[in-house]
């Protein structure tokens, strides 16, 4: 609905905008900041609110004052809740698993989106400094690796080896979740690039912390080789030719989920190093997604049942979100040059919230 097309696939733009506004209004109105007892300020709600808020932001000129107010309440409440929550870690400094079998990288990285969205939308808010410090802390923590604890490096003025209380990613950039090296969770590195792009869209310099270990984690999908044995046959990289996904330690959410990776590929095509071949993988996964969709006449992607994708809370919706993110990310590949903020933020808390 943000394009200039007046008619697409038989649906007029005005109708799409009207439906989008209804969704934005309905979701934001039911947030706890607007409706006592409503949803929000809990697990994954930072991701839900950012998805809604970005849609509102893209259509801001079409929202009335009341709609803008409830969106603002939602965004600011989620950013403040995230700042209070602070970073969490999979392992402590000694390597002991604090949350056995489950990295916190997904939760920490999607939490990052809330303060980033708030910064982008409300540049004069009294909580702006706290949102920025919170976002920097979450970005550093999200995909921190064991080797970071011994390296001499400073990110936004923060001595990582000295200050980091734990780690979330494996040394090779992969992520452990559900007790296995899990590509479905490694792809959450897109949240760092998504947050960075939100700031770019607001013409705000992006803290260097937003890119911390991101390229390394993407290589866990596109470059890292898994030998078989000990990993499952046939071995190789997670990203296989023709858009297929190899799961080195088994399946969590389904055997055919190419759309899950289109979003991260879209951002990687903008931000990762050329040798990751992100553009080629983006095209392969998008083609495979389209091939799945062409099996049906109703626009859906997945077959009924749980074999291809078992996510019961909206597998089609999640696929569409990833495709939309890839499209949006692509618009920034040759967009305005990004400004990176290398300033020091010595009061960032890596061990607790605000």
Regions found by a protein language model. Give the residues of each.
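Aromatic-lined, polymer-binding surfaces characteristic
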Residues: 1-214, 223-228, 240, 244-259
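Terminal, non-catalytic domain-edge segments
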Residues: 1, 121, 129-142, 177, ...
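Histidine-centered metal-binding segments
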Residues: 218
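Long, compositionally biased, intrinsically disordered segments
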Residues: 13-33, 78, 230, 234-245, ...
């Amino acid at each position: 609905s943000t394009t200039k097309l007046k008619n697409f696939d038989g649906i007029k733009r005005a109708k799409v905008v009207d439906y989008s506004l209804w969704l934005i209004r309905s979701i934001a109105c039911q947030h706890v900041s607007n409706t006592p007892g409503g949803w929000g300020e809990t697990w994954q709600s930072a991701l839900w609110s950012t998805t809604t808020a970005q849609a509102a932001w893209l259509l801001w000129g079409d929202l009335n004052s009341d709609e803008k107010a409830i969106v603002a309440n939602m965004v600011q409440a989620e950013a403040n809740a995230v700042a209070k929550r602070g970073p969490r870690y999979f392992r402590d400094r000694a390597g002991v698993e604090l949350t056995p079998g489950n990295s916190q990288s997904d939760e920490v990285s999607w939490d990052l989106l809330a303060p980033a969205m708030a910064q982008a939308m409300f540049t004069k808010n009294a909580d702006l400094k706290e949102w920025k410090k919170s976002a920097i802390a979450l970005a550093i923590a999200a995909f921190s690796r064991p080797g970071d604890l011994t390296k001499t490096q400073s990110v936004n003025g923060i001595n990582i080896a000295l200050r980091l209380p734990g780690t979330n990613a494996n040394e090779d950039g992969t992520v452990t979740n559900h007790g296995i090296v899990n590509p479905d969770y490694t792809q959450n590195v897109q949240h760092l690039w998504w947050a960075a792009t939100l700031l770019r869209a607001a013409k705000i310099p992006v803290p260097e912390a937003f890119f911390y270990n991101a390229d390394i984690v993407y290589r866990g999908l596109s470059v890292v080789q898994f030998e078989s044995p000990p990993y499952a046959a046939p071995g190789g990289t997670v990203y296989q030719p023709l858009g297929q996904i190899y799961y080195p330690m088994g399946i969590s959410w389904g055997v055919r989920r190419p759309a899950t990776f289109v979003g991260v590929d879209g951002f990687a095509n903008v931000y990762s190093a050329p040798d990751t071949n992100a553009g080629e993988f983006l095209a392969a996964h998008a083609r495979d997604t389209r091939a799945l969709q062409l099996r049906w006449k109703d626009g859906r992607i997945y077959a009924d049942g749980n074999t291809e994708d078992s996510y019961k809370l909206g597998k089609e919706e999640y696929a569409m979100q990833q495709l939309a993110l890839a499209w949006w990310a692509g618009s920034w590949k040759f967009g305005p040059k990004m400004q990176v903020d290398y300033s020091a933020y010595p009061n960032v808390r890596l061990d607790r919230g605000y």
